[in-house]
Amino acid sequence: MSPSDDPISSIFFERQQAALCAQHALNMLLQDSLFTYENLRDLARQMDQMEHDILGNNANAVGRSENMNDSGFFSIQVIEKALETFDLKLINMENPAMAEFKANPLTARAYVLNLREHWFVLRKFGNQWFELNSVKNGPKLLTDTYVKEYLHQFAAENYSIFVVQGILPNSEADDFITLCPVVPKPTDFDKKEPNLVQKFFNSVGRRLGGSQEIPDSQEDRDLAIAMALSMESKESSESSGSDEDQLAKAIEMSLSQDPNIPSTSAAPSELTETPILGPSTSSETPSGRIPSAEQQRRDRAKFLEKLEEEKKSQNVPEE
């Protein structure tokens, strides 16, 4: 493979056949076509026999397997047995011994995941993470931020997440992507991404007086997209409150979660009520629209001033 080729094409990938996701997940994890259905079937039968010998009459009836089914699904025990040949182990992420990886998922080299009898893999090549899922069209590049969010979401949705322990066999993809990282390709979502990023940073810049430029860092872009989507969700789901109030809440949440977003020393309540004024002393924004929070503050001030004047006029002694 030459450097002119797309680096992602160096990743070994298998498309789904029947329910052989365990076979595909193993081969994609190891980056070679090492296991067949027959291999895993034989392992499953060996394990069934061992269980029968140990449990005796308490074992399942002969012919019924707990380690495979007719569609091609294989249990975690079969996958673990297959990986023993390569001195690799799978340990559930909820195991206390895996606390390091739960706190910082990026320190692992790969994960094997299962939900409702479907197996797939998250694996690192070079310094980049990829989802290897046999029901997809090919490897999917993931940013570090997305890997963390994926695993967090998977855990919330009751996926079984296993940390791959041991040294994975080196592959062509490891070497190639280390030298030539994969460049993300535009997708339908990417067409919307610039608008989402610009929306968030325009909002932050306008409200906080900071820069409205789109950041170069992919991590910052990912965070901006997430916050913009959050803002869109709030706008569509909440019928009460103005758009400006919802935007202020989203910005306040983002500031409390990420210290890298430009901020001021003002308290959150000040950020939502204090307008960002330019050189002009006009009380209106360039668009001629007064922010609702500021309008409310000014209305209160005018009311209090009027009330104070009325009190003073009532206290003036008659001549």
From Swiss-Prot:
The keyword Hydrolase applies. Residues 295-313 have a biased composition (Basic and acidic residues). It comes from Caenorhabditis briggsae. Signal peptide: none annotated. Residues 254-267 have a biased composition (Polar residues). Its EC number is 3.4.19.12. It catalyses: Thiol-dependent hydrolysis of ester, thioester, amide, peptide and isopeptide bonds formed by the C-terminal Gly of ubiquitin (a 76-residue protein attached to proteins as an intracellular targeting signal). Keywords: Cytoplasm, Hydrolase, Nucleus, Protease, Repeat, Thiol protease, Transcription, Transcription regulation, Ubl conjugation pathway. The keyword Protease applies. This is Ataxin-3 homolog.
